[in-house]
Amino acid sequence: MTEHGIKWACEYCTYENWPSAIKCTMCRAPRPSGAIITEEPFKNSTPDVGSMERESGSPLICPDSSARPRVKSSYSMETSTKWSCHMCTYLNWPRAIRCTQCLSQRRTRSPTESPQSSGSSLRAIPSPIDPCEEYNDRNKLNIKGQHWTCSACTYENCAKAKKCVVCDHPTPNNMDAIELANTDEASSIINEQDRARWRGGCSSSNSQRRSPPTSKRDSDMDFQRIELAGAVGSKEEFELDLKKLKQIKNRMRKTDWLFLNACVGVVEGDLSAVEAYKTSGGDIARQLSADEVRLLNRPSAFDVGYTLVHLSIRFQRQDMLAILLTEFSQHAAKCIPAMVCPELTEQIRREIAASVHQRKGDFACYFLTDLVTFTLPADIEDLPPTVQEKLFDEVLDRDVQKELEEESPIINWSLELGTRLDSRLYALWNRTAGDCLLDSVLQATWGIYDKDSVLRKALHDSLHDCSHWFYSRWKEWESWYSQSFGLHFSLREEQWQEDWAFILSLASQPGASLEQTHIFVLAHILRRPIIVYGVKYYKSFRGETLGYTRFQGVYLPLLWEQSFCWKSPIALGYTRGHFSALVAMENDGFDNRGAGANLNTDDDVTVTFLPLVDSERKLLHIHFLSAQELGNEDQQEKLLREWMDCCVTEGGVLVAMQKSSRRRNHPLVTQMVEKWLDGYRQIRPCTALSDGEEDEDDEDE
């Protein structure tokens, strides 16, 4: 016997192995233990039942690893009596009135089709497909399903491999889709074989072709099959999707990622993500594109064309919506002095940083060495009315001004102060983010933003180095304030410490919103009182009251000596989670504006009268008083007079005097304001004809 004759061929890969091998050397398939039947039974003769029983009882060797017996005769008899579904071609049992797979109604046989009898059907059956071939097809597909192809080098790896053996490329995430596609391919092959058997069992070869389904149920089944085929998807489509997403990500910039994070933040209620996007200068009116929606991959939440406002309304984020709506109204072009003169602004920031010092001693708080108060120049009144209107639109926050004046009388409610005493307050526009408090403080003093976080750093360092002093005041004030509203409770020291740690953390985070305690510390850094005029209640964008704001009142630098502080306060406005600087316009200075008060000022000094009572003539609260400093209204008024220059007007309004002088003001601030105002002086408005010109025209006529 030759060498070729003693080898045995593998039934899977046809590799010729040595006689001693019990498995195939190439594919590891087991060696068959006997002859494999390759002849097709029932080829030219009618099968005999007895012979079929004997044949079914004989041992048949199957190349399948599970060694399933190949029972052919009984299987052919059963399939010949089954009926095929006209929708999915599935072979159902004769007693079934509906298809087991797709539930389609069994169709009645047409007159041209003769009923299937056992004899005729068996005689009409052509050479049936050998079950060996069917099992081989199944095994080939199973082997294919047990491997995955590397997308980088196209090497076929085992299913258990976590990465490619050749190039170490990780396993793709679409293994389920690949297996599903393989299963669909296997079922299609088997259905083709079943369909061939069914066609062979038909009595007449010239039967008419069946008409396509026209009923509503048949149409629905077609749609279901189409949707199922689309859901399976292919590996190529999945790879194209991954490639498309990768291209989108490569095109994304930092601003784009901040915008997507803000959108997710609105859905999940994360306000910090929205503030981070706003602080970076992002456009609040930006809409989601198709690529961005595809990248977010949450169709239930995001849709093309949505903005942050749409998402806030959809998910009922009222706090975010209030801030975003304010941002929309401020979307108009703004032009403040700090924007016109960037070089001077940088010099002023360096001056501020150089003027920050730390006091030596037990109370080691930081403070500013210069007293500066920002006012709008009186030369604005010399501009034409149209230019004045343009200037105020670009430098003021009209929404804040309207809310503090019209919606609730908080500022400029006294005609005596606003008209006769020239003490009208104007709300300057600034950034609507967590830094608005620090911006408004620097705007009320130096006329610029806290862009370099110089004031925030001084705030954090003061809170950290003087934590014991401020903590005692804060704890005592919070306890008294709660009891004043009838809330009698006691907290453990650990809870107080946790709340205080949160206040400290806010001071160190750029863009984080600040609280009343931070205003109290800022009063010590400035070494001057801070008066906050604000709304009393938090309200939603629908106008619903949500709670008390607690910001309005007077903040005195009580931990300093009075001799170390200035008595000229600054004013801030608070509306809907936003602080604004309230400044006055320069005036000529009058000696008789305060009833019974002799100001002893020259014409260069501007005196602004800031009311210490609200529109109902109730004294403003003084924040963070100790138990010894608390008292009745007369005692609090006495305390205000000790820390500020106060007087009573002819109308009986208790006011504090804010004094400023252009001559004594910082030269850099004066130069910045003059350069900003020159831009409006050069604007030539479209004026109408004068009276003299009209008369000349009349004479010509």
UniProtKB/Swiss-Prot annotation:
Keywords carried by this UniProt record: ANK repeat, Cytoplasm, Hydrolase, Metal-binding, Nucleus, Protease, Repeat, Thiol protease, Ubl conjugation pathway, Wnt signaling pathway, Zinc, Zinc-finger
Major localization class: cytoplasm
A GO term, aspect molecular function: cysteine-type deubiquitinase activity
Region (Disordered): 38-59, 108-129, 198-220
Binding site for Zn(2+) 3: C150, C153, C164, C167
Listed GO biological process terms: cell migration; cytoskeleton organization; positive regulation of Wnt signaling pathway; protein K29-linked deubiquitination; protein K33-linked deubiquitination; protein K63-linked deubiquitination; proteolysis; regulation of cell morphogenesis
Domain notes: The RanBP2-type zinc fingers, also called NZFs, mediate the interaction with ubiquitin and determine linkage specificity. RanBP2-type zinc fingers 1 and 2 (also named NZF1 and NZF2) specifically recognize and bind 'Lys-29'- and 'Lys-33'-linked ubiquitin. RanBP2-type zinc finger 3 (also named NZF3) binds 'Lys-33'-linked ubiquitin and shows weak binding to 'Lys-6'-, 'Lys-48'- and 'Lys-63'-linked ubiquitin chains but it does not interact with 'Lys-29'-linked chains. The OTU domain mediates the deubiquitinating activity.
Protein name per the record: Ubiquitin thioesterase zranb1
Organism from which the protein derives: Xenopus tropicalis
Gene label: zranb1
